Regions:
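CheY-like receiver
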Residues: 131-145
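Alpha4 helix (beta4-alpha4-beta5 surface) of REC/receiver domains from two-component response regulators
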Residues: 72, 94-112, 116-124
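Active-site residues of response regulator receiver
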Residues: 16, 62-64, 92
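Conserved acidic segment of CheY-like receiver
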Residues: 6-20, 25-29, 59
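Acidic, metal-coordinating helix/loop segments flanking the phosphotransfer/catalytic sites
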Residues: 40-58
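Conserved phosphotransfer microenvironments
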Residues: 60-77, 96
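Short amphipathic alpha-helix used as the core "switch/output" element in two-component signaling
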Residues: 49, 71-84
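A short, hydrophobic beta-strand element within the central beta-sheet of small alpha/beta folds
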Residues: 85-97
Length: 145
């Protein structure tokens, strides 16, 4: 009997220097998608290293990191904001006018204030961000590993 083809699972990288927030969001995502892969990084450099080491479907990025600005990491992840090769959802602790728009102008699909974001909100944003990037031409989406 032929074996079923293996369906690739969703891989999400969660980069957040706040241990409590990172664990909370990661736990929710793991519960919602038990077959998915949720990787965690506590700072920008380790997050970028993980991102470069394997194929990811989405990166959830906190703007407040211990080693650098989340915007620096965002620009590294999405060098051409109009042609994102990876879905990125940004989280922040700041309620600041214009911050969300700046994140979007730099390639993030969405930006949420952590205190007002549920795990369900984040999950929906991840799915929408992946769908959005999936609509891009393939040559704009895929990067060599």
């Amino acid at each position: 009997m032929p074996q079923k083809p293996e369906i690739p699972t969703t891989s999400v990288l969660l980069i957040d220097g706040n241990h409590t927030d990172r664990i909370g969001f990661a736990t929710h995502l793991k519960n919602c998608s038990p077959d998915g892969t949720i990787l965690e990084a506590m700072d920008g450099q380790s997050g970028l290293n993980l991102y470069r080491s394997r194929r990811m479907d989405c990166v959830v990025l906190a703007l407040e990191l211990t080693d650098r600005s989340g915007f620096e990491v965002l620009v590294d992840l999405v060098p051409i904001a109009s042609k994102p090769s990876i879905a990125v959802v940004v989280l922040t602790n700041r309620i600041q006018r214009g911050l969300h728009e700046i994140a979007r102008q730099n390639g993030a699909y969405a930006c949420f204030v952590k205190q007002f974001t549920t795990g369900n909100d984040l999950e929906r944003a991840i799915l929408r961000a992946m769908a959005f990037v999936g609509q891009m031409p393939k040559e704009d989406r895929y990067r060599p590993i």
